[in-house]
Amino acid sequence: MGIITLLANRRGLHAILSNAQRIVGCRFVSSSIIPDASRLRNIGISAHIDSGKTTLTERLLFYTGRISHMHEVKGKDNVGATMDSMELERQRGITIQSAATYVNWKDHNINIIDTPGHVDFTVEVERALRVLDGAVLVLCAVGGVQSQTLTVNRQMKRYNVPCIAFINKLDRMGANHNRVLSQLRAKLNHNAALLQLPVGLEGNNTGVVDIIRWKAYYFDGDNGEIVREDVIPEDMVDECRKRRQELIEVVADVDPELGDLFLEEVKPSESQIIAAIRRATIERTFTPVFVGSALKNKGVQPLLDGVLDYLPNPTEVKNYALDAESLDTKVLMDSRRSGEAPFVGLAFKLEAGRYGQLTYLRVYQGALKRGGFIVNTRTGKRVKVPRIVRMHSDIMEDIQEGYAGDICALFGIECASGDTFTAEGAPLVSMESIFVPEPVISLAVEPKNKNDLDQFSKAINRFTREDPTFRVRFDDESKETIISGMGELHLDVYTERMRLEYNCPVICGKPKVAFRETIGKEASLDFRPKSRVAAAGQYGKVVGKIEPMPPESITKNEFVDATVGMNIPKNFIPAIEKGFYEACERGFITGHKVAGVRFVLEDGAAHAVDSSEMAFRMATIGAFREAFNKAAPMILEPIMSVEVNAPQEFQGTVIAGVNRRHGQVTGTDANEGYFTLFAEVPLNDMFGYATELRSQTQGKGEFTMEYCRYLPALAQVQAELMDRFNVEKLKKAKR
């Protein structure tokens, strides 16, 4: 089982074992790749910001013997948590990028990815969940289900990731596990039930009760590393019986085997209940709920046991790849760790390391061996694997090979995030790519010192390669470099990293909202050049229509070739498509990008001598401009889901402030003298809200926001944007 490390007040082994209660768990120290897939777990720790994810991960590392000392996220020793390896993370006390590690617990290997909780870094959660088999959803016992919890829940659903829930921070004033359980059921639609009950709340929390194994657990030693087993307190027995029966009923509703026992009025055994919970959790029809306090070192070891008991191993999850030749054909991955099947892996994250680009990779099939050759299915390029490492935060440990189910990292591999690699000579397949949300905010940046342009370019190139939500473009008209991202914090972190990591301080312009131009109705297009003989190679006629995309695709554009016959030679169709997408890059009424438009090409004409790709591309741009102005053009703006928490005495003031910012209140919640306001507010109206909220609530209020959707902007906003655009055009025309 491992080497037991006894750290409890320097007491001897005999003294500890002579206690009246039984010692059932300590710290386990061992580390190895275990070939048996049943003893492997790939999990992520996900939650809303400040729910205690990184603190929980620090305890997981300590109790499994992976680290010898625990450090806090904002500890007095100024060391910072192990998984927050970036200097900026330790300064700000937040997780900015996901970090991977692995531990050994009771002869099982657990790969862990600690993810950010802030919505601005949501792509880190997205790509982590894409490659994981299970997750721990951390919930604050006071805050409960919050805005980013909803986002993480959607991401888990998108990738069919089973999860167990951990209600953290039971030591805090106002902690209420029952309220959080109700929110888990009502807001997230989880079929959930408690597997544990806390022994006391707030300052009186001393341990947890396991209602399945019918035992109480207390956590002794300087750091809670010794798990002491005891009988359930007498005053909790009745509630534990009630909760156990509730648990059995909830699981019996979704598990046929336990359901049969329940209908036959047969009392299920401990092992039967655990097996039923495992089946239901893996099928995502039930969510087991654990309780504890990571900061106070309570409930973490039973949570580790829960990861082994209820979350799937790689063979219990079905992963599919798409046949590269026929993307409609799905290929089931062979998750056996024998290495007999051809290798398939997904590069899910890139990071610039000390020795070059570090590519994080999940092995889905077969074996990856050092010195072997693999093929990038996107580029068709054959590459050698010079070095394979396992990551422990920012520390690398060399390994010779990785098998199906392993998460490792490669050096010296040039690729993009989301690329699939296969064995040399094997059929080409492609893993389904990672969902990447569109940026919602932009600002202009330039280096303070013109001599830093080289470092500035290096930083920009690296960050865009690592983070698909961080976009960069050069505006030809203003001659500015424009960076775009998921929020002000997202862009602030990258500009700060330029200063810290590249010694390149930058000057930032004012943030700009990513407005979009779209159309409100269908319009026909029939465009031909004014004169066929105007210039050689300049004839091209396009006929068709443009129409609005459905609401769920409002941020996308689509080109449809509906031509019949050869009026337009097929070799000119790509030029027409290129012209359409080129025209969408800069709109006609405000200069913002065009979105939510479907371009249907129905007919056209070409000339045997005077037609060219350039002619059709320019004809398409002209046709699109004419049709766009006839199709009820309008401006879309990003709407944010906003969640405000503040003392109840400020509720009226806060609601009035949100209304002034053209927000729509969607709900409120009250708890222990505080209220939570849920609203949808245009991003354009959210600038400066943090300062206003602090002023309104005497510094006691806080808020979070995340992108929700695009909606038509208010008429006044649209008019202002169009007027500003027209004024700028006039100024340029006079120059």
Curated annotation (Swiss-Prot):
SUPFAM superfamilies: EF-G C-terminal domain-like, P-loop containing nucleoside triphosphate hydrolases, Ribosomal protein S5 domain 2-like, Translation proteins
Transit peptide: 1-28
Binding annotation for GTP: 47-54, 114-118, 168-171
Name of a matching Pfam family: GTP_EFTU_D2
Cross-referenced InterPro entries: EFG_II, EFG_III, EFG_III/V, EFG_IV, EFG_V-like, EFTu-like_2, G_TR_CS, P-loop_NTPase
Molecular function GO labels: GTP binding; GTPase activity; translation elongation factor activity
Statement: the UniProt record of this protein carries the keyword Protein biosynthesis: yes
Keyword Zinc tagged: no
Localization terms from the record: Mitochondrion
Signal peptide residue numbers: none
One example of a Gene Ontology biological process annotation: mitochondrial translational elongation
Domain tr-type G: 38-315
Record key words, sorted: Elongation factor, GTP-binding, Mitochondrion, Nucleotide-binding, Protein biosynthesis, Transit peptide
Pathway info: Protein biosynthesis; polypeptide chain elongation
Recorded superkingdom: Eukaryota
Primary localization class, coarse: mitochondrion
A cellular-component GO term for this protein: mitochondrion
HAMAP family (alphabetical): EF_G_EF_2_B (MF_00054_B)
General function of this protein: Mitochondrial GTPase that catalyzes the GTP-dependent ribosomal translocation step during translation elongation. During this step, the ribosome changes from the pre-translocational (PRE) to the post-translocational (POST) state as the newly formed A-site-bound peptidyl-tRNA and P-site-bound deacylated tRNA move to the P and E sites, respectively. Catalyzes the coordinated movement of the two tRNA molecules, the mRNA and conformational changes in the ribosome.
Family: Belongs to the TRAFAC class translation factor GTPase superfamily. Classic translation factor GTPase family. EF-G/EF-2 subfamily.
Entry protein name: Elongation factor G, mitochondrial
Species, as recorded: Nematostella vectensis (Starlet sea anemone)
